[in-house]
């Protein structure tokens, strides 16, 4: 019998692959995503699909925006995927393929396709995946899949995802066609967008703190290098 990998195993592998320290504000993001991906990877009902991959890539790219040094972002993403014994290039390629499809489709056609009321010949693999999801009573719905759906809609029509009514209607149609809970879709995406806002606010606060600290250091440096006036002859 094969031993199921634990979260500790995955974390150990990750930190062996990416050995440089991760900035504090981003470490929680990386570890939460790592745990989420790990738990799905060991779930018997979970199977990889390109919409999930798009959700992983979107989540990572959005929450890691502004990470310094920028060159470490690729190393962190690669380690994240390899820690759960997955190929990072596979995730990236599937995500890019789906983004390109969504950009080339009117959003109504995309919603119909995702909701399985319209059949398009744009991508046979995605069509097969959508049908497999809709026909699988044990499909393991997850937050990253929801983010993948949201990312597709956003790529097709950025304005639609800003309109709560239109977004809710789109998610309802997609959920009905794929036989997943539209309530879960909406709640997961509300939390996702809320967390993005919180992350953006935290980055602003951090930037302000760094700027203030830099100014203080510059002031101290100027004071330490300022010439000391000699005592006057009257003293």
Curated annotation (Swiss-Prot):
Keywords: Coiled coil. Residues 213-235 are annotated as: Disordered. Residues 183-204 form a coiled coil. GO terms for cellular component: plasma membrane-derived thylakoid photosystem II. The keyword Ligase does not apply. Belongs to the THF1 family. This is Protein Thf1. The gene is thf1.
């Amino acid at each position: 019998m094969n031993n199921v990998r634990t979260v500790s195993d995955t974390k150990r592998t990750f930190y062996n692959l990416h050995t440089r320290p991760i900035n504090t504000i981003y470490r929680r993001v990386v570890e939460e995503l790592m745990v989420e991906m790990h738990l799905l990877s060991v779930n018997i009902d979970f199977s990889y699909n390109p919409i999930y991959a798009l959700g992983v890539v979107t989540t990572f790219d959005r929450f890691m925006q502004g990470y310094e040094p920028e060159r470490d972002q690729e190393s962190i993403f690669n380690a994240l995927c390899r820690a759960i014994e997955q190929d990072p290039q596979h995730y990236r390629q599937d995500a890019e393929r789906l983004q390109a499809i969504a950009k080339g489709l009117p959003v109504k056609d995309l919603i119909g396709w995702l909701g399985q009321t319209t059949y398009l010949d744009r991508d046979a693999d995605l069509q097969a995946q959508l049908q497999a999801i809709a026909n699988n009573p044990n499909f393991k719905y997850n937050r990253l899949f929801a983010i993948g759906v949201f990312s597709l809609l956003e790529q097709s029509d950025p304005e639609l995802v800003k309109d709560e009514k239109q977004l809710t209607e789109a998610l309802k149609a997609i959920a009905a066609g794929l036989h997943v809970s539209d309530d879960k879709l909406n709640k997961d995406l509300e939390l996702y967008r809320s967390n993005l806002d919180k992350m953006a606010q935290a980055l602003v606060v951090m930037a302000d703190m760094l700027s203030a600290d830099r100014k203080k250091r510059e002031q101290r440096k100027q004071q330490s290098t300022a010439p000391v006036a000699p005592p006057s002859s009257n003293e």
